[in-house]
């Protein structure tokens, strides 16, 4: 049985803003309309490293996205209703752009502007000593992989991840992470060890990447292993915040089984024990069309 879930979280409001009514469509009688776009028309805060995403009301195998003056790849999902555009290089910060959705209903241009994230930091060393928090239950955090189970997983991740910059220069970033006492991330949980990361390449500043590396964190009172933990994001030019954050890793769900209803060791009964085995969470998410991965540790689960 498989019981490891690949988790990818995004912390960027600009990546999820949607607006159907503001999109100007040149309609044709094909029965397909644009349901939503990200960024929405008129959005002025789009993350410069974000993918453009469009959802249609019905399948259209001809649909694609292009961006004026930008090279990239337009991709259509298996359902032919969702499509995305990935630029070959990051967009410029604080810059106006237009992307166009070409589909069976015609062409729909959408104007948007990138946020200031991506603007150069004058003195990278000024980041030293700064502490940043990632609240995994914040409204602007979206669990995108596995699709459809974000709300389920978020209920188990009542933690904040704190990142402190130890040092930074034009080429190297040194950061260590720690868990907050609660999801607000206002205070470190000193009973849990810090999570050191190897020195990171900072030549792409203000963008940074940490990991991947395997680590163990405490969640809801249980030690949970995250394999290949990877964190990335972009610091604001004045170092006051970071955005466009991505946290990615494979979570071993076995220690979290007692969090399921009726699986608490103090409340379980012979009637519920069969539903509380190591693969219980995997069986739960199977209902959302999500399959766990092999833990790869030689066990049966």
Where is each model-derived feature located?
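C-terminal motif of bacterial Sec signal peptides marking the signal peptidase cleavage site
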Residues: 14-17
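Extracytosolic secretory-pathway proteins
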Residues: 23-27, 117-301
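Short beta-strand segments enriched for Tyr within beta-sheet-rich domains
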Residues: 91, 95-101
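Bacterial N-terminal signal peptides that target proteins for export
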Residues: 1-6
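Short beta-strand segments within Ig-like beta-sandwich modules, predominantly Fibronectin type-III
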Residues: 73-79
